[in-house]
């Protein structure tokens, strides 16, 4: 099963457990948040990977677990339980921001925006043309914006020598998820 199909299944099951379907609009905020989180718990670890010892990421930022950066120092070690807690807290911040910033965006667009915010930072999303287009309901144009975010620390991640090939793969996945309509 593809990653997107697993995400759709996670969203569908979460909504069904709350008595809703994926075709419903105006979901209650807690239900929508739970559905977005369910998809991200599938998507984000697949893109980030999980490492229990601190390491400098491609951009030189000290990172641990599944992309957690806040307060990480060389030599830090985390348990699987700590990593899970970091992931849920960090994803929750991204989801809460996206739900406030783009409340009218379709569900899967919010999932893609939240993963993007998790990856590049809420501030970067807040200043982006991507978010402005999403808020304006210009979803085809917004989806094209993911392709503009291919650089890490000034290096073009489309170039194999720059050791960040996962970024173009992730941006294409985000673009595809952004456009999912069920």
List PLM regions with ranges.
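Long, amphipathic alpha-helical surface segments
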Residues: 1-53, 72, 77-88, 92-96, ...
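Structural recognition of the beta-strand scaffold that forms the well-ordered cores
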Residues: 43, 63-65, 112-115, 141-145
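Short glycine/serine/threonine-biased micro-segments
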Residues: 47, 58, 63-65, 119, ...
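Short, surface-exposed glycine/acidic/tryptophan-bearing loops
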Residues: 52-78, 108-110, 114, 130
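Active-site nucleophile-His-acid catalytic modules used for acyl/amide transfer and hydrolysis
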Residues: 93-128
């Amino acid at each position: 099963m593809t990653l997107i199909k697993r995400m759709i299944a996670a969203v569908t099951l979460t909504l069904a457990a709350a008595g809703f379907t994926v075709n419903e609009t105006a979901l209650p905020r807690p239900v929508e948040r739970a559905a977005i989180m369910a998809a991200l718990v599938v998507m984000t670890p697949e893109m980030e990977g999980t490492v229990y010892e601190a390491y400098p990421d491609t951009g030189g930022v000290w990172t641990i677990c599944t992309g957690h950066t806040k307060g990480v120092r060389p030599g830090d070690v985390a348990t699987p339980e700590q990593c899970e807690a970091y992931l849920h807290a960090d994803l929750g911040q991204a989801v809460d921001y996206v739900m406030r910033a783009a409340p009218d965006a379709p569900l899967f667009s919010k999932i893609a925006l939240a993963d993007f915010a998790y990856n590049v930072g809420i501030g970067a999303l807040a200043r982006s043309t991507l978010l402005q287009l999403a808020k304006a309901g210009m979803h085809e144009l917004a989806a094209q914006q993911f392709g503009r975010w291919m650089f890490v620390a000034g290096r073009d991640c489309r170039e194999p020598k720059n050791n960040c090939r996962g970024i173009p793969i992730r941006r294409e996945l985000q673009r595809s998820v952004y456009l999912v309509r069920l």
